[in-house]
Amino acid sequence: MTGEVRRKKILQMLQSQPEPMSGTALAKEFHVSRQVIVQDIALMRAENHGILSTNKGYIYRSDAVRDERPKRVFYVRHNTEQVLEEFLTITELGGTVLDVAVEHELYGQIRVDMLIESVQDARDFSEKLSACKDNPLKVLTDDCHYHTVSAPSEKLLDLIEAELRDKGLLL
């Protein structure tokens, strides 16, 4: 199978899957290494296919490039134990955590898609973080980081901002 054919099949699989698919699962499906899948995804994203890479795997979002919901970037600082509190604050008010970013002195901005859309997503991420040996990106910048958050309205973004501020999470 050529790379082009494989990429078309990967895209079809992701478009038909409502849940994220891991790079490992895709690699097994197509009998290639995970690195080949990572390269295929990078090529498809360069062609503006709406593929997001989240902590749960790859997901196709037809609205990923054209998400028209209001967005706001929040600059926050908290310890690892407060990650769940932060995400619950956002999701319980109807927000979605689209990504996390840090400003690294050497590498510049490092940004990772998250797509935390619900209370359950927040809890799942928190459990995964607790079980994981790796540290979150925020440890690179003394716990300071950015989240792009979308919500159905500017009013909800205002409420999210106020709640994050009241909880001492917003810088």
Enumerate the language-model features and the residues they cover.
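Minor-groove-contacting beta-hairpin "wing" of winged helix-turn-helix DNA-binding domains
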Residues: I51-S62
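Extreme N-terminal segment that seeds HTH/winged-HTH DNA-binding domains in transcriptional regulators
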Residues: M1-K28
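Residue-level marker of alpha-helix boundaries and capping positions
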Residues: M1, L14, H31, R77-H78, ...
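Solvent-exposed alpha-helical segments within well-ordered globular domains of core cellular machineries
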Residues: K8, Q12, K28, Q39-A42, ...
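N-terminal helix-turn-helix
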Residues: P20-S53
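Conserved beta-strand edge residues that scaffold enzyme active sites
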Residues: K28, Y58, H104-E105
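Conserved active-site and cofactor/substrate-binding residues in soluble primary-metabolism enzymes
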Residues: V5, M21, V32, S53, ...
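Mid-protein regulatory/catalytic core that forms ligand/cofactor-binding pockets
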Residues: E68-L171
